[in-house]
């Protein structure tokens, strides 16, 4: 293969030692065999990889945390995977309340590092998700009602474009790229290498909670939760998880940036429902709050494959929607399957839908569901039940979260991005007119008028 540009960084071609390990993602259900993996150590390695790929007509997939929930999005047959997971510098500026992080950092590492320094970094429900992917897709989590989405806190970025050129974006320079990078999804505009976020002073202590009920009480708990969650105090983040009938239960957990006494009072409309089997509500130092909520979620030892789908609720689920949920939960078998809800509103809804690329600001709550399996022969039926459930719930939800993608969604652009999709296509046409960065659900460039 003749080329002007040499690959740099840690380079692993198909057939090299370490290739199979490089292929592994959080979801082990991958059947793709890239030509080469480049584990970039610095921004120049990323630029060289893009130039090499262009010179050799090789398709590109960027990869940050290996946490993509769909096959085909971070790997491609015969292509180059530009993996930035070794780029892990973190630089906190306490005086200005900002932090610069390289894109290889995982969310848990950043949140824990900053908590020790007395600052809040927003996070989701898994510590092993890469900061790149979660930021570019919006970045939801239990702190969003108090300080906004992860992407709402993004001030500046560094990206390598389709020509291998390093560009920066902030409110004064390439502002359209900054706008698109705050919810427009990864793998669309270039390979990102650095992010600058505003950070917030952490409280010395905060309250965490985890309440568990038997599975057969999920309907009454959900009805109470969805009535209460959208309008509760903005400082309270709440996640509700409902496992499969076979071996599952109901768990509500989250945090309140305030006292235990006040948390108990705020939680009562839900904790008084049914007969909880376990109830933990405790005041902790903020560093321990982060550890409590970010349980280990290793990437390379996952056994279960998954199919996910997601949406944003227009209003509380009526009985018909809950009946469809029950049918799903009675038929899925994997222990990691189920429904997950996150309360909305607060700081998320105070940002206008077109102010950033993340459009779905006015929902009542966020919902996702997934099936899980080990044996590849069970994949088809598990994928089918998730997508059939989406059809049943379609009347009650809008959109879908790009970080929890579903390749069963047709004409996915408006579903992920709402009315922001046309503008995102124009940004794509400006920064990647040749559609070098693409995947089965990426944003195509707008056609020239």
Predicted regions and their residues:
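Soluble FAD-dependent oxygen oxidases
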Residues: 1-449
């Amino acid at each position: 293969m003749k080329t002007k540009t040499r690959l740099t960084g840690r380079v692993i071609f198909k057939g090299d030692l370490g290739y199979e390990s490089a292929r592994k993602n959080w979801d082990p259900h991958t059947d793709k065999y890239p030509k080469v993996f480049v584990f970039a150590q610095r921004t120049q390695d990323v630029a060289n990889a893009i130039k090499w790929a262009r010179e050799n007509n090789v398709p590109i997939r960027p990869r940050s945390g290996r946490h993509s929930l769909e096959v085909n999005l971070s790997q491609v047959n015969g292509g180059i995977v530009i993996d930035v997971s070794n780029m892990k510098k973190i630089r906190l500026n306490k005086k200005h309340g900002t932090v610069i992080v390289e894109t290889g950092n995982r969310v848990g590492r950043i949140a824990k590092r900053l908590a020790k320094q007395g600052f809040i970094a927003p996070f989701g429900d898994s510590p092993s998700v890469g900061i790149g992917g979660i930021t570019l897709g919006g970045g939801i989590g239990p702190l969003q009602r108090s300080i906004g989405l992860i992407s709402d806190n993004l001030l500046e970025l560094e990206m390598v474009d389709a020509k291998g050129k390093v560009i920066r974006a902030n409110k004064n320079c390439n502002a359209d790229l900054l706008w698109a990078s705050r919810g427009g999804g990864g793998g669309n505009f270039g390979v990102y290498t650095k992010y600058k976020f505003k950070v917030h002073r952490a409280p010395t202590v905060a309250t965490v909670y985890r309440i568990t009920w038997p599975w057969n009480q999920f309907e009454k708990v959900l009805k109470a939760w969805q009535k209460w969650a959208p309008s509760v105090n903005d400082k309270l983040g709440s996640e509700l998880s409902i496992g499969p009938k076979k071996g599952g239960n109901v768990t509500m957990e989250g945090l309140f940036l305030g006292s235990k006494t006040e948390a108990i009072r705020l939680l009562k409309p839900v904790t008084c429902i049914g007969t909880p089997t376990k109830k933990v509500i405790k005041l902790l130092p903020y560093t321990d709050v982060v550890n409590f909520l970010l349980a280990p979620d290793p990437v390379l030892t996952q056994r279960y494959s998954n199919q996910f789908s997601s949406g944003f609720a227009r209003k509380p689920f009526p009985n018909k929607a809950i009946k469809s949920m029950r049918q799903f939960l009675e038929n899925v078998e994997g222990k990691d399957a189920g429904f997950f809800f996150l309360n909305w509103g607060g700081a998320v809804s105070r940002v206008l839908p077109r102010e950033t690329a993340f459009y779905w600001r006015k929902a009542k709550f966020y919902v996702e569901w997934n099936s899980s399996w080990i044996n590849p022969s069970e994949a088809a039926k598990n994928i089918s039940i998730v997508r059939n459930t989406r059809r049943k719930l379609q009347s009650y939800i809008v959109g879908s979260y790009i970080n929890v993608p579903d390749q069963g969604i047709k004409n996915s652009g408006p579903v992920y991005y709402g009315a922001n999709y046309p503008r995102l296509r124009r940004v794509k046409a400006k920064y990647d007119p040749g559609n070098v960065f693409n995947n089965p659900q990426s944003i195509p460039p707008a056609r020239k008028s």
